[in-house]
Design a protein with these regions (language model features):
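Glycine-rich hexapeptide-repeat left-handed beta-helix
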Residues: 309, 316-463
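Catalytic metal- and UDP-sugar-binding loop of GT-A-like glycosyltransferases, i.e.
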Residues: 10, 29, 107
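Conserved core of the sugar-phosphate nucleotidyltransferase
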Residues: 59, 114-200, 207, 217-218
Length: 463
């Protein structure tokens, strides 16, 4: 296996074309930031040292980088512009730490699909040919914005020309620089020490370091086997296009594993989601975070699940659930909102316009419609009538409601927590339950009906 001694991740850019007050590298891509994705791919190669270069909103980016890898060396780029200067700063810092030798990987952090396998292949090619440096390239149908790879007649790298410095013939070249390189550490140290800003942008270009590398040894080229993995994101149009292409791949991957995805164009599945064979995902579904869907479950249409476990045979229709567990054969929806912290047991129901938060619903219990259940435990085989509310908040504390098994809660009940309702209880419609109810009881509020005959509303009386 190819050895990686140092990795330098470039995360200094503002990303002005994103037109955002969020640094480009901290934008989300299918549940993770660009920077997180790149750092995860690099960290899987187990470099001895990993440096992250920051500049725009430096502390914000540095804080994110440390959260992804607490051992990362944070390097702040000064006011001198360019990727070459960014690498200079990293090299100087690593040299001060006496940690700069062997093979160095340089990676831009605006390629959210850059994968460990591609980086490993680059390092293997670099090592196999004993190169001074190796450039990762790709051939794109639309190379706009990328530096062009200019080869000599023998196919070797002649130079890399940035878009704004390229002439008409060079702009026709479709092989591009991906801004990913492998360098010998000593070669890189020499190369970056001689960089200048003699170009149209007045910046230190890292690509100029390859000229020095060519004087020392061979500069190789490794073409990426997967163009999608090395596509960068410069604006939100590119972000949307890359997200769509990635998501189609994800959906197709699950379909090949035995999952039915009715419409991949309208189904979004993040990378950490797990789905078992024979699950069915209907259009308009968004599966996020650590969501896991078991066999024979049916999700959708128009459903969002975030960090939610769906057990075998459960059905979730036109609903949203977050940080919840839905038991075997549970039926959720339509228009159910499960806020964080719910556990619904086997064959339970949370029906139309039901909201739950930190609720435990035991096997066979049903909350069919128009109810709020929060900070509550409802035991097995209980039915909760429509329009029922657990009034859990007293203005300071969230209080608990306990409802026993085989209970029939009437329509329009309000349970004022903290309160406990025992087993086998029946409550009358419209009851306000403020005090504990023992087992095997009937409870109802004495709300007398008053009828005023020949009544006229105010607007009628004023005529």
């Amino acid at each position: 296996m190819a050895r990686l001694d140092c990795a330098i991740i470039l995360a200094a850019g503002e990303g002005t074309r994103m037109k955002s007050d969020t640094p480009k590298v901290l934008h989300d891509f299918a549940g993770k930031t660009f920077l997180r994705r790149v750092m995860d791919s690099v960290s899987a190669l187990h470099p001895r040292n990993e440096a992250v270069v920051v500049k725009y909103q430096a502390e914000r980016v540095a804080q994110a980088a440390r959260s992804y890898n607490s051992d990362a060396v944070i390097v702040e780029q000064d006011e001198i512009a360019g990727t070459g200067r960014a690498v200079q700063c990293a090299v100087f810092e690593l040299e001060k730490l006496n940690e700069f030798h062997g093979t160095v990987l340089i990676v831009a952090s605006d390629m959210p699909l850059l994968d460990t396998a591609t980086l490993h292949q680059l390092l293997e090619a670099h090592e196999a040919h004993n190169n001074a440096a190796t450039v990762l390239t790709a051939t794109l149908q639309d190379p706009f914005g990328y530096g062009r790879i200019i080869r000599d007649p023998q196919g070797n790298l002649l130079r890399i020309v940035e878009q704004k410095d390229a002439n008409a013939s060079e702009l026709l070249v479709t092989e591009v620089n991906t801004s990913v390189y492998a360098f010998d550490a000593e070669v890189l140290s020499q190369a970056v020490s001689g960089l200048s800003a003699d170009n149209a942008q007045g910046e230190f270009y890292l690509t100029d370091a390859l000229e020095t590398a060519r004087e020392i040894g061979h500069v190789g080229i490794f073409q990426s086997p997967d163009n999608l993995s090395v596509e960068g994101v410069n604006d939100r149009v590119q972000l949307a296009a890359l997200l769509k292409a990635h998501n189609i791949r994800v959906c197709e991957g699950w379909m090949r594993e035995g999952v039915t995805v009715i419409d991949p164009q309208t189904t979004w599945i993040e990378d950490d989601v797990k789905i078992s064979p024979d699950a069915v995902i209907l259009p308009g579904t968004y599966l996020k975070g650590s969501t896991a869907v078991s066999s024979h479950a049916v999700i959708g249409p128009d459903t969002t699940l975030i960090n939610t476990q769906v057990d075998e045979g459960a059905v979730v229709e036109r609903s949203r659930a977050e940080d919840s567990r839905l038991g075997e054969g549970a039926v959720i929806g339509p228009w159910t909102y499960l806020r964080p912290g719910n556990t619904l047991g086997p064959h339970t129901k949370a029906g139309a316009y039901v909201e739950m938060k930190k609720a435990v619903i035991d096997e066979g219990t049903k909350v069919p419609h128009l109810s709020y259940v929060g900070d509550a435990h409802i035991h097995e085989n209980t039915n909760v009538g429509g329009g029922t509310i657990t009034a859990n908040y007293d203005g300071v504390h969230k209080n608990h409601t306990e409802i026993g098994s085989h209970v029939h809660i009437g329509a329009g009940n309000m349970l004022v927590a903290p309160v406990t309702v025992g087993d086998n209880v029946t409550s009358g419609a419209g009851s306000v339950i403020r005090h504990d109810v023992p087992d095997d009881a009937m409870v109802y509020s004495e709300n007398s009906q008053h009828t005023v005959e020949q009544w006229k509303p105010a607007w009628e009386r004023e005529k």
